[in-house]
Structures are given as structure tokens and as C-alpha cells.
Amino acid sequence: MKKLFKISAAAAMIGVLALAASGCGGGSSKKANVTNEMVKFGVTNFADNLDPADNFFSWVVMRYGLGECLVKFDNKMNATPWLADKWSISDDKLTWTFHINDKVKFSNGDKLTAEIAKESLERTFKLSNRAQSIFQYAEIKADGQNLIIKTKNPTPSLPGMLADPLFIIIDTKVKDRDIKKQGPICTGPYAVKTYSKAKAVMVANPNYWDGAVPFKNAEIPTIDDPNTRAMALQKGEIDFAINIAAGDLQLFKDKAKYNISEIASLRTVLAQINMNEGKPLHDPKVRAALIQCLDRVTYNKVLLKDTFIPGKAPVPPSLDYGFDQLKDPNAYNPENAKKLLAEAGWKDTNGDGYVDKNGKNLEIDFVFYSGRAELPLYAEATQADAKKIGIKVNMKNVDYNVLDPMRQKGQFDLIISNILTANTGDPEVYLNWYWKSNINGSQPQNSTGYSNPKFDALSDKLAVEFDPAKRLSLIHI
């Protein structure tokens, strides 16, 4: 029994722009105010600060136009040059040489050198245990504008790994800056003017190296509630809104007023199941019963208006690894779910509507955050369907900054989040984070107790395989 159930995969990523060029605004009476002087983005935000080595905050640093990496991805998820304009690998497959683009400057005018890039990467590894779970290096050194990384083992995906926002390059020459309060000095098109979790104000980087910066100023208010975010766009209070809830999409169908950007996502929504000994979901029959009682098809069709699809595998169909050929082993079957609970010794002996054993009801704590509109909907639907077979689900809505530490400490029975499945170009790192055995903290995201030697062996083969066809075969579901 896998340690997590996929209740949704390949979510559509949806953003809306209130059109300004046509003279139409973000609502029926107010015009959008997009100009070269100012643009306003309504976003969700989980970052308490802008230190890219803290938590997953590097994603915000990049999304806000501050940070850039040595490498980036093209539209087909191929690793392409960014701050490094070329790279090569030694014959022994252990030493990579990345040449730093001589044109790149930080927002304060400092030139990006290989030495600064080296110090920035070393800082990330010092402060983030997640970096070690992506790749491990034996040595990093600078030789002129060449950044030389020697890995402990052959690492075929290293360029893609360095495209993860965790490895944003910051100016380490600046010693007197409080990065958590002021944000880092980076190479992106914008620099921080002011930052709080509630609102960020960015200004154009006067030293930007890669073309014209479109707006002189950008205001980025945090509007976590999806309905409020949609309303702000309608009223013309913001010019862009991201992650529009499925139920609000019909508000923006007027193409004269709004432009909707919608793509098949590489993200997936998954709930991890804590199967450690002593937990209520330690019993495989109870885990199977829980999964089989959930009507995921209806969740996605009715609650989310077909903007999501039911999941049945770790990797979504937007990545070509055989998703459509799979049969869901735990499809919706509430009657069989009840049977499984009975076989596991859980029965409602006192008529309170919940199954019990040894005088205790079967209760599970479901931890979620509400920054993404779909997560509370799934949690509520899970609570309702689980009750039908006698499982009591206690809802725990927490801030994301609380959720991830709870995940790493195993302080949950169920925990749900929205995850990127190819942050390094393919699913290798994502699969390792949530499925590979967590030995001495090597995979801190996997605190569920799940461990499978067969998976670990396949993962170890994938980690050193350079041939694309063989990598595809190893990942293929």
C-alpha cells in the first residue's frame, strides 16, 4: 500500500489578466491600470521572508522577479542556459564546469562572478537540508568565470537540479544586509523596495542584464482567499490574479475584458498517509478503506469544474510516463471500504455513527492549508465521505509555514499539499522526496514510515543513469 493517495493530478494552472490595451478594465465599470509605471498582481503567498534558503521561500523569490538560477527550463522542460551560458562534464561524469555569463550584474551593480556563485551555492547547502536531498557535492571551486562542481556520485540531472529555485544565486559580497527582512540582492529584473507577507513592493532593476524591464514598479498584495482575489480583479484593484478558483472562472469569460492563461500543469495535489506504527492508518486495510471511500471523480467534476482530474499514480499525465494506461487499484468502492474496516476489527458498537475498537473511535487528523482553493475542498469532501463509512476526520487548517514542519516531524495522519512533480526537469527528485526511504533524515519530506527496497533500488539506478531512454524506462510507471 503506497503511503499517499493521489486525489488529483495535472491541475490546470489558471491566471487572469484584466486587459488594458483595449480600454476595458478589470470589472464592469473600473478600468485596469496597467501602465509602464505600475502593475499590480494578486497572489497567494506562504513566505514569511525572502531568504531563498529558508523553507520553500525561494519559489516566491523567483516568482516575484528577484532571483535567477544558473540554469532554466524551456517550454519542453529542457535545461537551457541562464546565468551560466554553457556547461560541460568530464569523462568520469563527476566534474561539471559551468561558465558564468560575463554580462550578468546584480541589482546593486556588482558583477556576477564564479566565486560569488560558489559562495551562494555553499550558503544554500549550509542552511537547507533540502539541498542535500537534491544532490551532493564533493567540492565547488571557482576558476576565473568557470564554476566547477565535483559531485560525490555521477549526477546526470545536475543542470536541471540547479534550475530549482532553491539554488537562486544571491550576492554574497553584501555582508550588512538582513536578507530575511530586506530580501537578497539578486540578478532578476526586479529588486525589493519593501516586503511583508501581506504585501511586496518591487522596483525595476536598473542594472538588469537580460533585456528591458516591463514595469518600473510592481505591487504584489497577498490575497489568499480565492473569492476575494477574484473580486479584487473584478473591481480593478489588481491587474493580474493567479490561481483563480474553478467556481470563479465563469466570471472572467468576457474576452474583451479579461485574458485567461490556462495550461496543463506539472503540479499534483497529494495527501500523504502516516503509516508509522501506532498511527490509526498503520493497518493496510484501514488505509485501503479510507482511499476507497473517497469519490474523487465527483470531487473533480463537481467541486472543481473539471479543472482537475482524479489521480491514480505519482506522476501526472502532463508528463509522459504512462498515466493513461494505468488502472486505479483503489477506485471508489464504499461498500468494499466498509468490508475492509470490519475485517480490520472496526465496528460501530455504540451507534454513534463511527466505527470503534477497544472502546476508541477510529479518528484521523487531516492537516491542510487554505492558500490553494482546492485543498480545503478536498479536505471537507474527505471528511464527509469518510463519515459515511464510520471514520471520523478532524480538520486542521494551518499556515503553510506550520504545515511543512508538521510534515517533516510526522505530526499528522493525513496531510495534503500542492506539489510540483518535475522541479528538476523530470520526476526524479519529487519521487525521491515522497517515496524513497528516509534514512537518517535523508528524505525529510517522507516522514510517513513508507519504505520500499525495490523503489530505492530503482531510484539508485536512476540517479546515475545518463541515457535518456533508460531514464524514461526507469521512471515509467
Predicted features along the sequence, with ranges:
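Gly/Pro-rich hinge or "lid" segments in bacterial periplasmic/extracellular proteins
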Residues: 74-78, 163-213, 217, 334-335, ...
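Aromatic- and charge-enriched surface segment that lines or borders ligand/interaction sites
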Residues: 85-127, 148, 280
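Ligand-site clamp/hinge motif
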Residues: 206-251, 392-394, 399
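N-terminal lobe/hinge region of extracytoplasmic solute-binding protein
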Residues: 42-89, 122, 185-186
